[in-house]
Amino acid sequence: MTGQSPIEVSAVVLRDASGQVLTVRKRGTERFMLPGGKPEAGESPAQTAVRECAEEIGVDLDPEALRTLGVFTDAAANEADRQVRGTVYVHPAVPVVAAAAEIAELRWLDPSAAPLPQDLAPMLEHQVLPALRDLPAED
């Protein structure tokens, strides 16, 4: 890794009634990750998460319903030799209609699947999914 600062992002865990986690794949990439992205000037991590979910998957999240899962650092999925630091939230289930903006594909993932798919972003696989395994599905 280079000496550059980590790329700051916010992301949201959305789970269905069975506990599956919504993942997205951005156009021109191969890795699945949580919906979310980089902040715009002056945005808080929570504001970034809400805006990105509206843009990427067409859902309006309630900022008051966001619960912080954690802040995780890992290898960036789509930028070689970079780290990403993500503030990750959990939000109650909302209807997800379709991919929008730069999202090419949506996929629901069983976080307890073994083995996990090989096309997951490092932070999702190494940090977020292990943190989720201890939470009830409805959180």
Description of each model-found segment:
Residues K26:
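Short loop/turn segments immediately following the C-termini of beta-strands
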Residues M1-T2, A137-D139:
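Actinobacteria-biased recognition of intrinsically disordered, low-complexity terminal regions
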Residues L14-R15, T23, H91, W108:
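Conserved hydrophobic "DFG−1" position in protein kinase catalytic cores
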Residues L34-L69:
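The catalytic Nudix box helix
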Residues V88-V90, A98-P136:
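NUDIX/MutT-family hydrolases
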Residues M1-V21, K38:
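Conserved N-terminal beta-strand and adjoining loop/helix that marks the start
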Residues F72-A98:
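Active-site-adjacent beta-strand/loop module that shapes the phosphate/pyrophosphate-binding cleft
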